[in-house]
Each structure stands twice: as C-alpha cells, then as structure tokens.
C-alpha cells in the first residue's frame, strides 16, 4: 500500500504534532504556515546533533582526536554541499551564518575589482539581495510584470543598454513574497551573453527543488540552513574563488590569515580568508544532516504534492469575498508554496493574530523584508 505523502513527509519533521494553546484555553495541533520565514528541524538533524555533540571540538586548532574529527566533518561537508547543488569542481564553499551574510561577502569582494560597474537587482528581491549592493555599486532594478514575474525583456533591455558595464545580476531563485520561481536558465543565458555574472539568492528555492549550478549557469549561490529544516545558524556561499583572492575579507580575525606582523597581513586563500573566527561547527553538522535527508527524498514527488496543496489552498481562498491574492495565477506550476493575500479593511497583523490565537495557525505578516 502506497504511503500517503502527508504522512510520509510529516514524520520527518520535529514538532509538527505538538499541541498549542488558543485564546479560549483549548488546545489544537499547531499549523506551521510560516515555513518560508524559518522551518522546524528534521528529526534526523536533531539526532545527528545529539550524536555528534559528545565529539565536538575546535577545528583547525589542534591535533586532539575530537578536533581532527570535527575538522574532517567541517571540510568534507564542502564536498557534500557542492554535490548537492551541482557546483563546478573548481567552485569553493564558504560557510556563513545565513544567506544575508553570504551575499554581503560577495558584495564586499566585488567592490575591489568592479569599480564603476553596475549591479542589476530586481523588484522582487528580499532586502538581503538589495541593500548589500547599494553602498559600493551603481544599481538598477529589473521590473516585474502584473503577475509578479520577472520581465525578461526588461532584463535584456538593461543588459544591452549598459553596454557591457553590468558586472553582476543578483536575483532570487524564488520570491519570498509570491513564491514565483524564476527561470534561471533563461536569465543565465542573457546575463552571460552580455558579459556579466549571475548570483542566485537560493534561500527559498534550495529546499524545494534540485539545483544544478554548473548546468544552469549559476556563478554564485547563497542559501540558509534555517529554511531547509536545520535552524541552527548556518548557511553557505558557493562560487568561483577568483573574486575572493584579491580582496580584503568581509570579516577580519583569527583563522583567516597565514601570517601577521605589526605592519603586514598575509590573508589565507579562499574559502578560509572569509571564515574568520571560530565557526559554527554544530550548525554545519545540522546543515549537512538536512542535506542528507533531502537527498533521500524524491524531490519530484515533493514538488507534485506541494503543487496539489497550493492548488487546494488557493481554490479555498478564492471563495473568500474581497480577498486579494498575489502571485497566484490560475496555473501555478512555477511556484513554491508561498501564498500572499490581503483582506479588505483588516490590518495584516490582526489577521495573523486571529489565525494564531483562534486557530493555532502560524503565518508571516508584514512587508516580508521585501520593500520598497
């Protein structure tokens, strides 16, 4: 007998069957509709952390058995991450706190070699893929259409119009407001045709579909573990090492150098020069465990089940009088499970409170860090 997809996937995640109190004193099983903001952990991730904790030690800083064990996990994890996202063999993996830090690292590195160049972002970006570029680059924004989809014609118009002066196009893989999935191969083709490079903010996309960096023409990819069932403060940046070689690191400190005198600093090679300080080894262990779990799943089955849920929920929401749905066309095949809506004359925070206090349903409300 084929197992119900809901049962199959729910059993992997910790805390989804916990009862929470309502305003009237009763209790219900909580519903996590705020997973786009952060996810609960996989049970396998918690087990991995529990099993690894007694063996945890500092990395790259000793020859003790536990230190060697921890260092091996940390370094071998880079290979797993590269394989997970289909990176080029020459790409490097930089461990980060989250997607935001990863993008800031790229922005810092590029400013040393892209003076006078332009960065293109889009009108559908999270602030993490907008603000880091503003202080060091001239910027322009690719428009979106009435459905919230990226306007590829406008992208080409701007790439052509800047006559080879665009250094980088920074675009989200999937919108954290509408869930719309960008066509990365089409974007990549245009970006490279006009001599630029492509950075993908993969925070919302990586947990939902397989990524093939080399095949899809992605030069830099950033993502967070806390959006892929490993909420323990880690993330990753994958990309070409060249831009990180001739720059000051984004964060300076121990572990990022080979030699220091009073008047000289010899920075280590990337990725190490961008990983100053004692790293979050437990967070990396959690990220790697989450990747192992995702690799065991049939992502096509996950996608099909997700699309069924999206269709079901949108169909129900359309029955509510006056509701405003965003990024929800009749056909929603190019979309992850994010549904944005408003109700007339009801403030968003009040809607969120009613859902939580009276229904046990957790949602994200507000601007989603995606203004202006």
Question: What are the residue ranges of the model-derived segments?
Answer:
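Pyridoxal 5′-phosphate
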Residues: 1-372
